[in-house]
Amino acid sequence: MKILVIFIMASIIISCNTDTKTVANIVVTESLDTISDEGLSDWELFIKHFPRKKSTVVKDYAGNVIKEQSLGVLNTKVTSVQQCADAAIRLRAEFFYYRKEYDKIKFKLTCGLEVPFSKWALGYRVKINGNKAILAKTQTTNDYSRSNFEEYLKVIMTYVGSASLSRDLPHSNYPKIGDLLVLGGYPGHVVIIIDKKTKNGVDYYLFANSWIPAQDIEIVTGTSTGGETIDNYIPIIGKTIIQINGYKFQTPMDIRTWQNQN
């Protein structure tokens, strides 16, 4: 029942071309073992069972084709400001929005100011006071609608990036589904762990990311000093260098995790 609830939650995210394909049912032709859903957090289940689009074409926010063929595309909304780190922000915010846990939707801007959606819904907005950003109440409202949520995300995606995620999210020595690999910088890069499998005691991970210009969240692969990539799943063994889309991540140093997994 828990899995079904999470899957339904993911499936109703606003987008087009909804299909029954999910991250979890990507075909693996070699002997990687699927991990059980038992013991996974709600957040891990949400990502693992997130729906994929029927098409593997990658498009930008305006519908222009970026890539004719890919490993797969996550079935979620894309806006004009949704790049790189914003893909992780989108998934994390959607997770709590559909659970109506609005107080858990909160991100810190690059300047360090935390902006909760629960405050935004009550009419608070980011304002500059001297040389400092603050949250100030500018209107009397109680608006948790999808349209207001999207307006909130537009601001968050504009002022939150790889540098602030690298700074603000906790480190983790043990990567899990839903965790991030983060190169904080201007620009930096962020990739999301969307699935995990095992073979002979080694953990293999599948990743996704977005890019510039703002575009679909695409399933991606790469190489690892931890061993051979198997059917697009990348091994991580202790201190490992992973290369994806030309970016080099070091584990565990670049692993970031989210608080509130359930």
Language-model segments: which ranges?
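Substrate-binding/catalytic groove segments of enzymes
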Residues: 97-101, 190, 199-203, 215-218
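Sec-dependent signal peptide recognition
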Residues: 1-7
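C-terminal motif of bacterial Sec signal peptides marking the signal peptidase cleavage site
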Residues: 12-15
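Low-complexity, Gly/Ser/Thr/Pro-rich intrinsically disordered linker/tail segments
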Residues: 206-262
